[in-house]
């Protein structure tokens, strides 16, 4: 099987996705298990829970299931925002890294204009992303949004900021 060519467009999309993934992991560096599992905002999500959601509902779902057509395991939690008590935050971060590596392999083997191998019509109805290009844009936007959520949580935990604004 030949790999699709790397174009300026695909390189730009992959660079943007990599930057957002690095942001997610980078803003959490140095936090303790307790901090990663502690709800910070009134909605009660945790940093570990958000990364678990990104691993399962974003990376695994969009790339392995939708793009590659791999079935989602039956044991996947209905609420990926909740990390089981017996799973450490470090294990959640490792799972996210693994899912991004698996996703990258799928992306590298798929042309940008390839349609999804599977589409969950029961979830989305008539709404549909047409190809890998649109799926990448969707995942970049969702990951960036959640990276911003993690920025706010981190600043509330210990004052650290990913981007420091000056006057």
Where are these regions (language model features)?
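Acidic/histidine-rich alpha-helical segments that form the ligand environment
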Residues: 80-120, 131-144
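Short, contiguous alpha-helical
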Residues: 2-3, 10, 14-29, 33-80, ...
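Active-site rim elements
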Residues: 8-13, 89-93
